[in-house]
Amino acid sequence: AARALLAAGVGHGERIAQLTTPRPEFMVLYAAAARIGAIWLGLNPRARYDELGYIVGDSRPRILFSIAEFEGRDYGDDVSRLFSESESAEQLVMMAPEARTPAISFEEFLAGGAKIDAATYEKACARARPGDAALIVYTSGSTGQPKGALLSQGGIVRTCLEQCRHWWAEPFRIIINVPVNHIGGAVQGATQALVAGGTNVLMERFDPAAIPGVIE
C-alpha cells in the first residue's frame, strides 16, 4: 500500500483522507502513510456533507478514500462531490468491489504499487522520521470551525508505550468499535496494539449484544 501511495503521487508530508469505519483498509493505509512520512486523516462516516467538505478543504489531501455504504447511508454521491470540489485531491478510491467513474476500486489502487521499484520505495521510507506528522485529528475548539491537530509518529509511539505500562494484559487484544478519525480509535486502539505486538479486533459499529461474544 505504501508503494501504491507513492505511485499515486503522495509524497513526504502530504495528506491522504479516508472516510471509514474500523476495518482492515484503515489499518493498511494508516500504516502505509506513516511508512513514507505521509499523513493519514480520518473522516467520520456520521458527519454531514458540510462538515466533511470543510475538513477536506482545510486539510488538502492528495487522495480521498471512502467506504461505499454504512448504516443505510450511500456515500457515492457525497464523496464524488467532495472529490470534484476539492482543490487538492487527485484521486478518489472507493473501498468496494466496484467503483464508478471518477473513482477507482481499492484493488486497482493497490495494483498501482507495482510501478514503484525497490530503490524508489526504500528511498521514500528512509525519509520518514519520528518527528514527522503521522495523523491529523480535527477537534472542536471554543470558537469557529474544528481545528486540525498534528500528531507526530514519535509522539504517538511514546504515548502508546506509556499506555502499555499501565494497561497491559495477556494476550494483548483491543476491540476497536469507536470512530477511527480520533484518538480513541487511531491511537489508543489501533496503534497501541501494534506497538505492543498485540491484536486489533475491528468492529464497524458498537453492538452491545455482540460484545460478549467477541470478548469470548
Model-derived features: where do they sit?
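Conserved AMP-binding/adenylation subdomain of ANL enzymes
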Residues: 157-173, 181-216
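Conserved S/T- and glycine-rich ATP-binding loop of Class I adenylate-forming
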Residues: 16, 33, 64, 133, ...
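Residue-level detector of anion-binding/catalytic polar loops
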Residues: 39, 62, 199
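Conserved pre-ATP/AMP-binding loop-to-beta segment of ANL
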Residues: 94, 104, 113-138, 145, ...
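Conserved AMP-binding/adenylate-forming
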Residues: 2-50, 57, 179
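Conserved G/P- and acidic residue-centered "switch" motifs that form tight phosphate/ATP-binding loops
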Residues: 37, 142, 197
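Conserved adenylate-forming
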Residues: 49, 57-58, 62, 75-108, ...
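Short beta->alpha connector loops at strand-helix junctions that form conserved
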Residues: 43-45, 67-68, 204
